[in-house]
Amino acid sequence: MSNERYNARESEPKWQAKWDEAKIFATRNDDPRPKYYVLEMFPYPSGRIHMGHVRNYTMGDVVARTMRARGHNVLHPMGWDAFGLPAENAAIERKVAPKAWTYANIAAMKKQLQTMGLSLDWAREFATCDPTYYKHQQKMFLDFLKAGLAERETRKLNWDPVDMTVLANEQVIDGRGWRSGAVVEQREMNQWVFKITRYAQELLDALETLDRWPDKVRLMQRNWIGRSEGLLVRFALDSATTPAGETELKIFTTRPDTLFGAKFMAIAADHPLAQAAAAKDPKIAAFVEDCKKRGTAQAEIDTAEKLGIDTGIRALHPFDPNWQIPVYVANFVLMEYGTGAIFGCPAHDQRDLDFVNKYQLGNTPVVCPEGQDPSSFVITDEAYDGDGRLINSRFLDGMSIAEAKEDVAKRLETATLGNAPVGERKVNFRLRDWGISRQRYWGCPIPVIHCEVCGVVPVPDKDLPVVLPEDVSFDKPGNALDHHPTWKHTACPQCGAKATRETDTMDTFVDSSWYFARFTDPWNENAPTTPDVVNRMLPVDQYIGGVEHAILHLLYSRFFTRAMKATGHVGLDEPFRGMFTQGMVVHETYRKADGMFASPAEVAIVAEGDGRRATLLDDGTPIEIGPIEKMSKSKRNTVDPDDIIGSYGADTARWFMLSDSPPDRDVIWSEEGVKGASRFVQRLWRMINDAAEIAKAAPAARPDAFGPEALAVRKAAHGALDKVLSGIERLAFNVSLAHIREFSNSLGEALARPGAASPDVAPDLAWAIREGAVILVQLFHPMMPHLAEECWAALGQPGLVSEALWPQIERDLLLEDSITLPVQVNGKKRGEVTVARDANNPEIEAAVLALDAVRQALDGKPVRKVIVVPQRIVNVVG
């Protein structure tokens, strides 16, 4: 065996320079080969890449390199999702301009990514904060505006009075701003929205076509869109208890079958009826104000205590005008969902049951499980939401749920209240239009001008881009664009009067909703896309990113692609053909006696009995080994990719990230695992060098025949080719790596055989070893490209392995020498027989009739005939 060590520090920069010089990863848009577009979600330039980036981008690179070797014109670009609040926070905390901070981070992270050896087309690189990028985003905004897909509307929004900005629902925690801690106010504000709801049904239906997306992601989007079929019911209000002018209360329900179980109505705090009641009762007014201070995120509403206050208003049951139902203002009803009002049937909804138990409103079960005695069926603390038959429901009694729903719908459709039907079948969606206005500086400016004469005026195309000013100050809270002395002041493009620019900027999700399309031709200065190019290169064949983006980013991108199609920028509906969500990189946590966390670099781990013990490196103080958690700065359980690449090399880091666990699951970072990957790198290097020596004795031409030893090597090599490729195509990278290890063991055994390293080695074996070594290098090239290039050169192969085509698999070599066939006697399986693959019928018959199971089944009866279905089955007829 060769004793020369592989030196990653020397090898990796050398090959990266050669790739760059040869421009082998640059993609030509006019390349006639079939295209393959692989894309990992582009990063936010925070300043440092982390191990999650290493895993994510390594996966994409394996796919890109493999598809390139398979003869495709691969597009594998990289850019930067560069707008966002962290840059403004840095400006406030570090007194550095957002632009300078962002571009410095981009430079640092690009350098880090380049050390990984990724096969990226850096010529297509852009940042979303480049005016040359957001110019086209502004153009599309104006196109959407013309098409009615962008509108300005008044919405109730979460307003942080200290930071002076709108907060998303998820940023309101216990009624306070996540950053300032200030009590959040509900304000009606003008907001720019994209009309995603126009595509709600289409976005839902098209999920069925995305068969290369994870089921969990499709389910999350399906639930977020939230289609529900139900009935819009108009409840008359009792005039004696209702404020003047209010006559009815509309609710949308998916369970009209449970109307006879209604015990209360609940309305949102900002429902007009609640406002009318609050105007007359200080207690109701105080409760309404308290509701407005609470978070409106669904997760917070689901977990908060369900509270309400009786308005004194009474609604009349649609089937019984003498049945009055109390109307409550409740903290779990939101105005933006449905009609902002519900009816509560506590026996069959847990939230409603918790509510009535708190306020002692009682419950009446109206659906009884099959087989249960209706007279004894009661509900106490647990609602029943299963199937059954209707009870306590007058004319609905005995019906199934489906029958009762239909009966109620028909009756209420024909009943009237005023001049309109009491009931109307409706389809409702949970999805709401996408509010894109943000009161921030570091975002894409919204290209409209506000004129007192003309109103809202689009910025003319010739004046795009509307560029952010750089001389901004963050000394005051709120949006720096509002405080700028000159930027927002302009002239109206239509009448020339004094006017002001829109100072809201776009949600950063807009920036990432079309970047994949821009990558197809980022040099086009005149339009967001080049139609013939974008329609040829899209959709993205394989998109890779975290499951945390399953809803917003992926759903917004699906909408945006449709909006781009409607405005002539693309010719397709779905942006991503295949979607893969990788697991996280996790690590143990280490906690010191004072409760503070220690980083892995500060800790020594030693085995102790059946367990392990951790101490601080600097003074030997024992510390607690905590749970394995996602790498995070707060837990200090991060590992710096630069340290790993500097110590072991990029290929070792890449290999470890792929080898230890299925790619859709979390990978546990361990120093021992990395060391094991490093040892494997060295083993491969020695093995290929030994094979290169033997290959010198190989004939140039393929031998006419191969002996058993050579044939075994060739079978192992071509079997690995087939299995490794299959694993990569299924994104089962850990499976592919296991097959590479398996084949390396087979090749290692061949190299270790007596005589293999001899000058007199058999020509057929030398040829097979050379072929096997070349195949092995091509197999691990997508995962460890630097080592592969070094090994490729050691084997004397021409050019770069990064440009080599995938070897042709010889299918004959995948066939086993023997085959196992099921054996039936008179049509009933009795056993199996293993015979040579090329055995003839008489040989198969003899082997079958010699089986004890066959003789026992025949029980002395003569054999009438033996039917052999080649390569399939044998049937004995007795």
Curated annotation (Swiss-Prot):
Instruction: Give the encoding gene's name.
Output: leuS
Q: Which Gene3D superfamilies match?
A: 2.20.28.290, 3.10.20.590, HUPs, Isoleucyl-tRNA Synthetase, Domain 1
Please provide the record's keywords in A-Z order: Aminoacyl-tRNA synthetase, ATP-binding, Cytoplasm, Ligase, Nucleotide-binding, Protein biosynthesis
* EC nos: 6.1.1.4
Q: Does the keyword Lipid metabolism apply?
A: no
The protein's name is Leucine--tRNA ligase
Which reaction is the catalytic activity of this chain?
Answer: tRNA(Leu) + L-leucine + ATP = L-leucyl-tRNA(Leu) + AMP + diphosphate
Species the sequence originates in: Rhodopseudomonas palustris (strain BisB5)
Question: A GO molecular-function term, please?
Answer: aminoacyl-tRNA deacylase activity
Q: What is its main location?
A: cytoplasm
The record's annotation in PROSITE patterns points to: AA_TRNA_LIGASE_I (PS00178)
Which family, according to UniProt? Answer: Belongs to the class-I aminoacyl-tRNA synthetase family.
